[in-house]
Design a protein with these regions (language model features):
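Sec-dependent N-terminal signal peptides
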Residues: 3-12
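Sec/Tat signal peptide C-region and signal peptidase I cleavage site
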Residues: 14-18
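Active-site catalytic motif of lipid deacylating hydrolases and related acyltransferases
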Residues: 19-75, 159
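Lipolytic serine-hydrolase domain surface
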Residues: 22-30, 37-41, 117-210
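Gly/Ala-rich beta-loop-alpha elbow adjacent to hydrolase catalytic centers
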Residues: 81-85, 89
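Short glycine-enriched nucleophile-adjacent loop
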Residues: 89-97
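A short, hydrophobic beta-strand element of the alpha/beta-hydrolase
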Residues: 106-108, 128
Length: 211
């Protein structure tokens, strides 16, 4: 188990000298309904190795895509979002496959109602924190060409409270931190093992965890 986790976290790694650019997307509705994304953004901006953090409406995928295409090719790219914003992250990261850009995606309760975007082979790491009891609002688990490594984390939180839940926020912040500064990836490893210790299934590229 520990060896598999270490292999997964190696997929998060980028050269220590490379900066990381981050795009975060709000969920459906007024931005204030996704206030947890602003909280995550504030924490992510303080992480070592993070170069820039952009926070957008989930519909601003073209803007995020254009900025990512123009970003320094030595930078790592991370896309994250809550609800429809998680789907937006998948959409932008997947589109970057046509530009031969790798990406990391961190989704918090992506929705089955906001577009069924697949994982793609240019995604070095995909992390999906989801909940089954949300009438589909926060239970989308994408399929597709496998990402470098995929982690599904089931946390049974109501959809409306997921973005502000401390564990959901730590899932996102620690994952960004592991990309931006590989020397700190052990923090994500420890967090997942402690807070989602039960493993339902796993193979070489995917693990399904739950609390």
């Amino acid at each position: 188990m520990r060896k598999l986790l270490l292999a997964a976290l190696i997929c998060l790694s980028s050269p220590a000298w490379a900066a990381t650019d981050v795009w975060l997307f709000y969920g459906w509705g007024p931005d204030g309904w996704s206030s947890g994304i602003d909280q995550i953004a504030r924490r992510v901006r303080t992480l070592r190795g993070v170069n820039s953090v952009h926070v957008y409406d989930y519909r601003e995928t073209q803007r995020a895509y254009n900025e990512a295409v123009a970003a320094n090719h030595e930078h790592s790219l991370v896309f994250g979002g809550y609800s429809c914003g998680g789907n937006a992250s998948l959409a932008v990261a997947g589109a970057l496959a046509h530009n031969s850009r790798t990406a990391h995606v961190i989704a918090l309760q992506p929705s089955i109602w906001c577009g069924r975007y697949p994982t793609t082979s240019n995604m070095r790491y995909f992390q999906d924190t989801w909940s089954s009891g949300t009438f589909g609002l926060g239970s989308y688990m994408p399929e597709g060409p496998p990402a470098g490594y995929t982690v599904f984390v089931e946390r049974p939180n109501p959809h409306g409270a997921a973005d502000t839940d401390p564990l959901y926020q730590r899932d996102a912040v620690f994952a960004v931190g592991a990309v931006a500064d590989p020397s700190r990836r052990w923090i994500l490893e420890r967090h997942l093992m402690r807070t989602a210790p039960h493993v339902d299934r796993q193979d070489a590229t995917v693990i399904w965890r739950r609390e």
